[in-house]
Amino acid sequence: STWPAKDIFHEYALDFAKKVNDMTGGELRIEVLPAGAVVPAFGLLDAVSKGTLDGGHGVLAYHYGKNSALALWGSGPSFGMDANMLLSWHKYGGGKELLEELYKIVGANVKSYVYGPMPSQPLGWFKKPITKTEDMKGLKYRTVGISIDMFTAMGVSVNALPGGEIIPAMDRGLLDAAEFNNASSDRLLGFPDVAKVCMLQSFHQNAEQFEILFNGSVYNGMAPKLRSILDYAVEASSADMSWKAVDRYSKDYSEMQTKQNVKFYKTPDSILRNQLKVFDEVVAKKS
């Protein structure tokens, strides 16, 4: 996976693997390793495409540097869709076919499954509350995907890092602030140890989802019934992940507030409006 072993995202990858292993009765077995065990998190697509790994678990935003159109899958306001709507577009509205074409363009030999609707993500973790757009200018801030372009245009100094590298960077002062994803991941990675202010609501990634990759040759070599099991395991995992997220994230938000003295603030409307304005400008330049 592209996640540290302690991250709930790695747990989601393990959940998917268990479903496949159980349903195939051992005929197909998936072993899940954490980020860095074989390749760095941002190297997943290349590693799976080349066959260094048979498969992997991550997000499309980590491949954004390959083709900016990959931002359509949840990195940005997503044109008014939430994550479930975007998954509907992916399965029934032509998104799956578009993604296959994009992977052909970048030369990736992979079978991609997009699944797992994520809730809207916080603006992130800061040393003090953010009250206006100007407060973010010049901040050394972590994000990924087309959000890099959006925040850069807003005057933020952006550094794209995988999840496992964020807290050490904040601890050493290489970052002033950062976003990752959700209460459980953020808590497990250690955000409350380096910052006590979390700003909720943002449009930078309000409709993101996960991606499960398989090497194209490995996938095509599977028996049809095994490919069908993968199809249904992905859909079952998508639902299970969304239910687990509601339960775990809400508990961790509450416990960070009551046990770790984290203060949560709503992101000001002026920042949210500016995100939408700047995102439209970024998209216009890239179109």
PLM region descriptions:
Residues 1-86, 104-287:
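N-terminal secretory/targeting leader peptides
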